[in-house]
A protein has these predicted regions:
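Short, conserved loop/helix-junction motifs that constitute active-site signature segments
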Residues: 162, 223-236, 256-263
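Pre-P-loop entry segment of helicase/translocase ATPase cores
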Residues: 67-127
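Post-DEXD/H (motif II) to motif III coupling segment of the RecA-like Helicase ATP-binding lobe
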Residues: 70, 237-238, 243-283
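Conserved nucleotide-binding/hydrolysis micro-motifs of P-loop NTPases
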Residues: 174-176, 199-200, 211-214, 245-246, ...
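N-terminal accessory nucleic-acid engagement/regulatory domains that precede
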Residues: 1-88
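Inter-Walker segment of RecA-like/P-loop motor cores
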Residues: 184-226
Length: 283
């Protein structure tokens, strides 16, 4: 039986060493998915692309969330992992399940000016279920319908994860930045936003769009911004992505797999789980 070495480089990326090219090619094929609309794209028409998206490189690189597929392919090809080099930063996550009275127990009430001013903030049963599912799975995705109080859910998750570092909440547009910020303020959290002309730094929790992070990165690289993306993300241990199905966008994918690759807590919320296999695998 052949052998190989598995390197877990961070919370997202893996590399496998010692495989012959045939096995690497089989892994790449097992984690390659067709793009249904590829035939309409110029690269496909010109014969420069096979119309598929690959999640395992022929050089032996892949992703942690595909390890089950990797192990299955290796077993079929009589290859054993004899050495595991886990380079992830060691952290012991310990979460206590929440109840509907989570914020009430913190002494938090709806603030002045809110329609429920002076009343205790009580979580709804489906919010409690969603939060506890996330706490049981620190790297996971859940389908949560629009209008189900996602901002209170994310505020609760951010507060619970405070002992482990900063949280970064990525939303798809500016209006959701402001909506999310409002509930974080209602819950008494130390929150800032980063978009447009509002760029608040040094906060425990930051709400932004992925477009704003991309602009920051580009401006620093061309010398027009003093702050680098790495400096902006320093201390972030929790990433919460709203409408995570948009993570298939290349910019957001790069942020999550490169700049934020060491964050141990990674939660995604979406109202729409992608139906296409290649889109689902990308998140």
């Amino acid at each position: 039986m052949a052998s190989c070495k598995l390197i877990i480089e961070d919370e997202v990326n893996i590399k496998i060493e010692g495989l012959d090219v045939d096995v690497r090619r089989k892994l790449a094929n097992a984690l390659k998915f067709e793009v249904p609309y590829a035939r309409y794209m110029p690269q496909y028409k010109l014969g420069r692309w096979d119309g598929k998206v690959a999640f395992f490189g022929i050089g032996g690189t892949g992703y942690v969330n595909h390890l089950d597929v990797v192990q299955e392919v290796l077993a079929k090809n009589r290859v054993q992992i004899v050495d595991i080099d886990d380079r992830r930063h060691p952290i012991q996550l310990d979460f206590t399940p929440v109840t509907e009275n989570y914020w009430k127990d913190q002494g938090v009430q709806w603030p002045e000016g809110h329609p429920a001013e002076g009343e205790d903030i009580i979580l709804r049963d489906y919010q409690v279920d969603a939060i506890n599912n996330f706490l049981n799975n620190p790297q996971s995705l859940q389908q949560i319908a629009t209008g189900a109080g996602k901002t209170i859910t994310t505020a609760t998750l951010s507060h619970i994860s405070e002992p482990y570092g900063r949280s970064l909440v990525i939303v798809p547009n500016k209006s959701l930045v402001e909506q999310t910020e409002e509930d974080y303020i209602n819950c008494g959290l130390d929150v800032g936003v980063y978009f447009g002309d509002r760029k608040q730094l040094g906060k425990t929790h930051t709400i932004c769009t992925w477009q704003s992070l991309n602009i920051l990165d580009k401006k620093h690289k061309d010398g027009s911004a003093v702050l680098s993306l790495a400096e902006f993300l320093e201390g972030v241990s929790t990433i919460i992505v709203d409408e995570v199905h948009q993570a298939k966008a290349e910019v957001l994918k790069n942020l999550l797999t490169r700049n934020l690759r060491n964050a141990p807590i990674r939660w995604g919320l979406t109202g729409t789980v992608p139906k296409e296999k290649f889109e689902f695998e990308s998140i």
